[in-house]
Amino acid sequence: MEITTIDTKSKLKLNKEIFAYTYNEGLVHQAVVTFMNNARSGNSAQKTRSEVSGGGKKPWNQKGTGRARAGTIRSPLWRSGGVTFASKKRDYSQKLNKKMYKRALRSIISELCRTGNLMVVSDFQCDNHKTKDFLKKMNQMEISNALIIMSEVGENEYLGSRNLIDYDICDVTTIDPVSLLRFEKVVVTEAAIKKIEEQLQ
């Protein structure tokens, strides 16, 4: 299996086991859900009426005042009262076996290859850290929305792209299913292709 680099027009051999893998939609969905759940902090928390400080004494007599009956000043109906269905800290993390995660990444990369959304460049380097020059480089390649995968991310490439919503840049070790699916195109350097093959073998 071969792919043509978009800059030098040279042919690059690809490993069929990684770049022509059968697409498994269920596994990809599981990997995406697991990744997104593992990114959740789960720190949202409120206090119920029993946890809020104070409210032990009945504010006024049950009868005789003409006011509505009340048993505590920490009722959810009151200002400074507890929350009726208070959320609690929760661990959302899920486990996904390494083999399953690798197969999911193979499925996504292979599907990108089949649909023509995986593009290979011989090398990707920026002369400086200016966002303007980074955009100019991407416009020359006619790519308006992409994830760029490099073997190692240089400082110029990182600084030039970090303020742009339509582009993201990462190295091979930090590839994740959500980023691969989020962008229209995935641009990979030749050096990164070799590392991907080693990593997903």
Swiss-Prot record:
It holds the Pfam family Ribosomal_L4. The keyword RNA-binding applies. The keyword rRNA-binding applies. Keywords: Ribonucleoprotein, Ribosomal protein, RNA-binding, rRNA-binding. One of its GO terms (biological process) is translation. Residues 42-67 are annotated as: Disordered. GO terms for cellular component: ribonucleoprotein complex; ribosome. Part of the 50S ribosomal subunit. One of the primary rRNA binding proteins, this protein initially binds near the 5'-end of the 23S rRNA. It is important during the early stages of 50S assembly. It makes multiple contacts with different domains of the 23S rRNA in the assembled 50S subunit and ribosome. Belongs to the universal ribosomal protein uL4 family. This is Large ribosomal subunit protein uL4. It comes from Legionella pneumophila (strain Paris). The gene is rplD.
